[in-house]
Amino acid sequence: MLSPRRTKFRKQQRGRMKGISTRGNNLVFGDFGLQALEPAWITSRQIEASRRAINRYVRRGGKIWIRIFPDKPVTMRPAETRMGSGKGAPEYWVAIVKPGRVIFEINGVSQEMAKAAFRIATFKLPIKTKFISSRV
């Protein structure tokens, strides 16, 4: 699963997801892509599950690029712990995804195959997505 090797700070504040994605919102590497339509935190497990689903469907046919990286730590307190005594330990990593952000790109496969692979991958993600193509 994806996670940063090292970070400047162990814990982060939650922040908020306002507006649309101004960066990473068009295709760069592949011919087809999966674009987010809603804001969400996508965990490294969800990214890995969708990557595996795409790989399983495409087999050795195409090349896949993951355009998001989980670089935000989410902390959790142990169950049944009293209030106070600081912030919990980092539990998992998430990628902040805003509407318009390209999540995956794929190359070397037909449009029908790419569409079907991304459809399977979408079921693993907590957001609505849309299929985009660089071909006109």
From Swiss-Prot:
It is found in: Plastid, Cyanelle. Pfam families: Ribosomal_L16. InterPro entries: Ribosomal_uL16 (IPR047873), Ribosomal_uL16_bact-type (IPR000114), Ribosomal_uL16_CS (IPR020798), Ribosomal_uL16_dom (IPR016180), Ribosomal_uL16_sf (IPR036920). PROSITE patterns: RIBOSOMAL_L16_1 (PS00586), RIBOSOMAL_L16_2 (PS00701). One of its GO terms (biological process) is translation. GO terms for cellular component: cyanelle; ribonucleoprotein complex; ribosome. Part of the 50S ribosomal subunit. This is Large ribosomal subunit protein uL16c.
